[in-house]
Regions:
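Histidine-centered, transition-metal-coordinating active-site segments
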Residues: 1-79, 83-89, 96-97, 130-347
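Alpha-helix boundary/capping segments in eukaryotic regulatory proteins
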Residues: 92-93, 110
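A generic, well-ordered mixed alpha/beta core segment in the N-terminal half of proteins
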Residues: 99, 103, 108-148
């Protein structure tokens, strides 16, 4: 008996009837022989962890540029926090932890350098538009492994595509945005829980806001600390979802109200704060200038990207290249292309 089969039987005996069982996966983009040790979602998680795109997340901005301090979140630490929150919720609800972890670790692989500044400018100047969730799916489907992709399961791919979007609904009930699995719903709400709390934590550290600026009723409801905020939201998701099992992942109207109020506060006082917005505009220009330059100088683009030829339309290849950059790589490339180097006088 294969170890994978033993683990799949364990899932059948221990997971909720609402959980996505590995044995019942909808399959992969391309058929392949499955691992005899790891169930499919665990295999997907491992592929994501070992991908180059995952490693690059450590040098991509969450909200505050990493050079400002060692304790600010990066896109990688955000991803790990989402995975931890999602696994806590999944374990309590007897859902598939391997699946929530795989989706969590892959959900931001397509994020641009400089956080949402990079996403906004690429969406504005690329004719087909740009969304980081769609780019994350493109990373795992096409760009990794030199163009062959990671060949992930449909459930992980769906969860990556349908994770939270900006000021969208906290919990999606119906419609095209609702994920295929409960596990993907868990990741969606865990993503929101993570950034609602840690972006406030980082904003206080960066002196963009003070603890006294947080609305009093939000402090009373969530608690005064980072850990209390997370605990309140996680407990709210778990207990409401247990109560309304048939409906999917749920939160109370009261929790939804305060989560949205906290999110509105973040947008108004942090993301759009003068200090943050000033950096945003500078990063916007870096991405815009690189895109425009490469569009006009295709030979230079191929040289910098290490390509012999375009593998897709020119604009698409340029977007893939820029979206995959880390903050520091984008800085260095901008400096290399646009800033004059000092004269070197031989002695």
């Amino acid at each position: 008996v294969k170890i994978r089969q033993i683990l799949e039987e364990k899932e059948e005996n221990t997971l909720s009837r609402y959980a996505q069982k590995s044995r019942l996966t909808r399959g992969r983009l391309r058929e392949e022989e499955e691992c005899d040790i790891r169930p499919c979602f665990q295999h997907d998680r491992d592929r994501i962890i070992h991908s180059k795109a995952f490693r690059r997340l450590k040098h991509k901005t969450q909200v505050f540029l990493a050079p400002q301090g060692d304790h600010y979140r990066t896109r990688l630490t955000h991803t790990l926090e989402v995975a931890q929150i999602a696994r806590t919720i999944a374990k309590a609800l007897a859902l598939n932890e391997d699946l929530v972890e795989a989706i969590s670790l892959g959900h931001d692989l397509g994020h641009t350098p400089f956080g949402h500044a990079g996403e906004e400018v690429l969406n504005a100047i690329y004719p087909s538009g740009f969304r980081h969730n769609e780019q994350s799916l493109r990373v795992v489907d096409v760009l990794e492994r030199d163009g062959s992709g990671l060949n992930l399961t449909m459930e992980v791919r769906d969860g990556i595509l349908r994770h939270s979007k900006g000021r969208g609904e906290i919990v999606v009930r119906d419609g095209e945005e609702r994920p295929l699995t409960r596990e993907a719903e868990v990741v969606r709400v865990s993503d929101i829980i993570a950034y609602l709390s840690h972006d406030i934590d980082d904003a206080i550290r960066g002196q963009v806001i003070s603890p006294k600026d947080i609305p009093d009723d939000c402090v009373r409801f969530f608690g005064p600390t980072h850990s209390k905020r997370i605990d309140t939201m996680v407990r709210g998701v778990i207990f409401e979802s247990l109560r309304d099992g048939e409906l999917g992942i749920s939160i109370s109207e009261e929790l939804e109200y305060y989560m949205k109020k906290l999110r509105d506060f973040l947008y108004e006082r942090v993301y759009e704060a003068p200090l943050v917005h000033d950096v945003f505009l500078k990063c916007y220009k870096i991405i815009e200038d690189l895109y425009t330059y490469f569009l006009k100088n295709p030979a230079r683009f191929l040289e910098e990207a290490g390509l012999e030829d375009f593998y897709d339309e020119r604009e698409r290849c340029i977007v893939d290249f820029i979206a995959g950059m880390t903050d520091r790589y984008a800085f260095k490339l901008y400096e290399k292309i646009f800033l004059p180097l000092p004269w070197r006088i031989p002695f």
